[in-house]
């Protein structure tokens, strides 16, 4: 057995880069690491990604929350749980808190979102990456997504507020992701290694 880590934050905050660099360094330090993301590669996850997100299909927020929850059950039972049992530090980009933040910002009751996700385990550690919206805009612009940001600025601000409120309520660590990437990664590494002590095998020791 090892641990399950969820890295959260709004679009453009740097989750993918931080997870990739963190995983590389954890492996260098002797840990088994498995990275994943949501929507997952399950049939439902692929449907969400290709038929809804990539095509900008309008879907009732409550229905979308149910689709994410269904994908999450498959993702947890078929990928996350087995890998944790095999001794991997599993790091996912997005999990339950993404549904809380995004569908919650679309008017879906947070209590209901949590209830429909109660069939999967909570992570051992949830890390929220945060950055000013102008930093996020710059990063999305570099990815050719400035138009997306400009269309969704108010929504992303609302999502960010939900993340920060949840972090306060649930004592999730919030990392300033506007800094130099090495500093961000070092903070995430410290949090994960502290949680992994006594639970995950380090093959360098």
Curated annotation (Swiss-Prot):
It comes from the Archaea. The keyword ATP-binding applies. Keywords: ATP-binding, Kinase, Nucleotide biosynthesis, Nucleotide-binding, Transferase. GO terms for molecular function: ATP binding; dTMP kinase activity. It catalyses: dTMP + ATP = dTDP + ADP. Its EC number is 2.7.4.9. Belongs to the thymidylate kinase family. NCBIfam families: DTMP_kinase. This is Probable thymidylate kinase.
């Amino acid at each position: 057995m090892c641990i399950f880590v969820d890295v959260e934050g709004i679009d453009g905050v740097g989750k993918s880069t931080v997870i990739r660099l963190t995983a590389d360094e954890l492996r260098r330090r002797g840990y088994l690491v498995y990275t994943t993301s949501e929507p997952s590669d399950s049939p439902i996850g692929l449907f969400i990604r290709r038929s809804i997100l990539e095509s900008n299909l309008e879907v009732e927020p409550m229905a979308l929350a149910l689709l994410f929850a269904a994908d999450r059950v498959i993702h947890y039972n078929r990928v996350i749980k087995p890998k944790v049992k095999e001794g991997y530090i599993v790091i996912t980009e997005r999990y339950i808190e993404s549904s809380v933040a995004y569908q919650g910002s679309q008017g879906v009751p947070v209590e209901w979102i949590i209830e429909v996700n109660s069939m999967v385990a909570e992570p051992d550690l949830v890390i929220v990456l945060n950055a000013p919206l102008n930093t996020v805009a710059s990063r999305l612009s570099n990815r050719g997504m400035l138009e997306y940001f400009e269309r969704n600025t108010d929504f992303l601000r609302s999502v960010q507020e939900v993340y920060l409120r949840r972090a306060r309520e649930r004592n999730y660590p919030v990392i300033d992701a506007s800094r130099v990437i090495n500093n961000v990664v070092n903070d995430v590494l410290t949090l994960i290694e502290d949680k992994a002590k006594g639970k995950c095998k380090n093959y360098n020791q």
